[in-house]
């Protein structure tokens, strides 16, 4: 089972446009290649798929091509936090603003900010980091969304809180409305 592969590739297709690549790699092609790679390796465990489209070669900083792709699939067992929960630290690293970088797109550069926060959290003995916006409001964690239930209400940062509008986030919001009778705030 590949979790919302089509939606992930549609977002990658959109992200290429925002990044102004000369060539836009078709999402269906990436889906076919990803399925082919998973089948060829006969994975039977939880895996992490990373599909990337990037400017290749030795172009200048403003280069928009040539465009290349890479798809990696590696086994990644579910983290203990899924069963046991985790400890989290509010990071001193502030989430990069959507005004500075297009955080709504899937872009490798967007991960570096969260990477620094997670390294700090681990060094301080925590499992995870929670990042705040420049205004001191909760944004998200490195490679994760933030949700909590307070007084029977599902609370999550808005899309204007410097977050990736993630497919996982949308899925949780849909499930909470449809099956849990929780309307998010």
Provide a role label for each language-model segment.
Residues 46-53:
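ATP-grasp fold ATP-binding core
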Residues 1-36, 40, 54, 60-185:
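Helix-start/capping segments and mature chain N-termini
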């Amino acid at each position: 089972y590949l979790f919302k592969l089509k939606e992930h590739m549609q977002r990658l297709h959109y992200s290429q446009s925002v990044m102004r690549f000369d060539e836009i790699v078709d999402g269906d092609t990436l889906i076919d290649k990803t399925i082919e790679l998973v089948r060829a390796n006969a994975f039977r465990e939880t895996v992490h798929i990373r599909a990337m489209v990037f400017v290749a070669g030795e172009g200048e900083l403003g280069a928009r091509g040539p465009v290349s792709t890479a798809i990696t699939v590696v086994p990644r067992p579910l983290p203990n936090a899924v069963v046991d929960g985790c400890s989290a630290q509010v990071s001193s690293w502030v989430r990069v603003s959507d005004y500075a970088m297009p955080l709504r797109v899937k872009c490798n550069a967007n991960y570096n900010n969260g990477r620094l926060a997670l390294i700090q959290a681990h060094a301080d003995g925590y499992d995870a980091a929670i990042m705040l916006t420049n205004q001191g409001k909760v944004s998200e964690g490195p490679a994760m969304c933030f949700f909590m239930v307070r007084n029977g209400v599902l609370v999550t940062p808005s899309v204007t809180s410097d977050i990736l509008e993630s497919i996982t986030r949308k899925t949780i919001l849909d499930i909470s409305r449809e099956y849990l009778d929780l309307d998010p705030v």
